[in-house]
Amino acid sequence: MVPLWWHISLGVALFVIGAAGVLLRRNILVVLMSLELLLNSVNINFIAFGRYYADFRGQIFAIFVIAITAAEVAVALGILVALVRNKSTLKVDDVTVMKG
């Protein structure tokens, strides 16, 4: 059996990569993919801890996170398509639609 710390270190590494992508990138699509990487790294940790403690709730919570993530991606891609049609850009800095 694989030790728990391998799963935790993989989850932490993916979380750091995703957080760096969200904070450092200016392309909306890359930020969205980095956010997905963040959520999937959390899912890895949920499943790893659930398996380590022989509890199925970690897997159930990961399934809920995946379902919520799918809805979030659908809404975000719809907004992304609307922004590309209106502004013709994918840069975060160029999008000031919500500014008053």
Curated annotation (Swiss-Prot):
Keyword terms: Cell inner membrane, Cell membrane, Membrane, NAD, Quinone, Translocase, Transmembrane, Transmembrane helix, Transport, Ubiquinone
A GO cellular component annotation in the UniProt record: NADH dehydrogenase complex
* Molecular function GO terms recorded: NADH:ubiquinone reductase (non-electrogenic) activity; quinone binding
Top-level lineage group = Bacteria
Give an example GO biological process.
Answer: ATP synthesis coupled electron transport
Q: Where in the cell is it found?
A: Cell inner membrane
Provide the catalytic activity annotation.
a quinone + NADH + 5 H(+)(in) = a quinol + NAD(+) + 4 H(+)(out)
- Please report the record's description of how this protein sits within the membrane: Multi-pass membrane protein
Q: Which Pfam families match?
A: Oxidored_q2
Q: How does it assemble?
A: NDH-1 is composed of 14 different subunits. Subunits NuoA, H, J, K, L, M, N constitute the membrane sector of the complex.
The family this protein is said to belong to: Belongs to the complex I subunit 4L family.
Protein name, UniProt field = NADH-quinone oxidoreductase subunit K 2
Q: Which gene encodes it?
A: nuoK2
